[in-house]
């Protein structure tokens, strides 16, 4: 995404100006709340930990698998296993597909799949914070403290990329870094007290 955007920005005569719209905070997304204000979240080998304790996975959680099928999936099998046309659109008998644990077991037991392997995600580039250089992935992420109203954190250049967006965008502060020092509203600081509570939302499709 980043490389593509940079290429387009550098070739405006060919692609034209980039036009954006303000983010609509009223847009609705259905996600599961897995982290509350003041909690510390970490993902280790795809399992979510809250304050150091493993979180029970939803029964219908999905992960992406690489499949080699012995046959094309019939419509009734897809419906039974909760596989949609969008999931299978690019798959003939070989490819990637999000599946529940139940679907994986059924495909194996019925001999429909010759091989199923979990797709392990080592991509660091499309992970929040994008400019953090923290080497986090979807499978192994954090730990990250979820801000709580009235709670303070020590701000450093290392953790600033994590909290820069809520401090600047959601809480309306001017934030700058000058000569290795952090300034909020033109005042040098090493701490910040949050004005709002934040929540960690995550979908059941964790591909």
Where in this protein do the model-derived segments appear?
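Extended hydrophobic leader/signal-anchor segments used for secretion and membrane insertion
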Residues: 1-207
